[in-house]
Amino acid sequence: MFPELNSLLGVTTDTLTLGKFTLLCDSNTDGSFLVHHFLSYYLRAGCRVCFVALVQSFSHYNIVAQKLGVNLSSAKDEGQLVFLEGLKSYTDLLFGDKSEAEETNPLCFLRAGSDLRPLYSFVSAALAPSAGQPWKCPVLILDDLSVLLSLGVTSLQVLDFMHYCRATVCTQYKGNVLCLVHGAEESGDEENELVLRSLSHQSHLILQAEGLSTGFCKDVHGQLKIIRGAVSSGKRGKNQPEIYQYKIQDKHVAFFARGLSAAVL
């Protein structure tokens, strides 16, 4: 995890806020560093995490996590992490036994053209409380919802799925939900824009990574907008975002106020 980001958000691994939905989004840049941060943060905090990875392989996430001081393989073996590797599930769905895939694959809705109930069932079962488990609150992380739209899932199906996930994980299980959605400029379609806008109004916290309007800079890789309390305030349009610029390094992300990078000073 990135300590500077924790400081900006006012959180530690000892103080967890429960029942919250966090929306991660990016525009003209790659916001995946936010996903890696929260994955390592919640594992370090001792939470049980269900990670739905629709973009990269398990080995990719594990390599990045090890740089951040977390071993995903150990977390899986200990039962702390439930990892759905979307790329492998796609392959099994396309080239595996059809009847078996439809029975056990959480992504079988892609072949059947049905709703996302199999994926929801997988998530709810993975995070269901059980007696004697040592983990703290359950956490669902999805990387990323835009992939489902590109595979033919409708915006209504995605929003229904997220509604049930939030109702189950946030309200019933007293846990947290995070998801990444690409900005509308990146995808260029109305379905993605509808999902992004709808989830923005439903979220408790929004982290939006943006590319610089001035173009590439080796010392400043982008800016991060932090919008708090989008749900609880009831005044989503009046919330003033906190804006920081950042530079991504190998094992660290440095944050600073706009115009105050080391290169400028």
Curated annotation (Swiss-Prot):
The keyword Nucleus applies. Its main location: cytoplasm. It is found in: Cytoplasm; Nucleus. One of its GO terms (cellular component) is cytoplasm. InterPro entries: ELP6 (IPR018627), P-loop_NTPase (IPR027417). GO terms for biological process: positive regulation of cell migration; tRNA wobble uridine modification. It holds the Pfam family ELP6. Pathway: tRNA modification; 5-methoxycarbonylmethyl-2-thiouridine-tRNA biosynthesis. The keyword Cytoplasm applies. It comes from the Eukaryota. Keywords: Cytoplasm, Nucleus, tRNA processing. Component of the elongator complex. Belongs to the ELP6 family. Component of the elongator complex which is required for multiple tRNA modifications, including mcm5U (5-methoxycarbonylmethyl uridine), mcm5s2U (5-methoxycarbonylmethyl-2-thiouridine), and ncm5U (5-carbamoylmethyl uridine). The elongator complex catalyzes formation of carboxymethyluridine in the wobble base at position 34 in tRNAs. This is Elongator complex protein 6. It comes from Xenopus laevis.
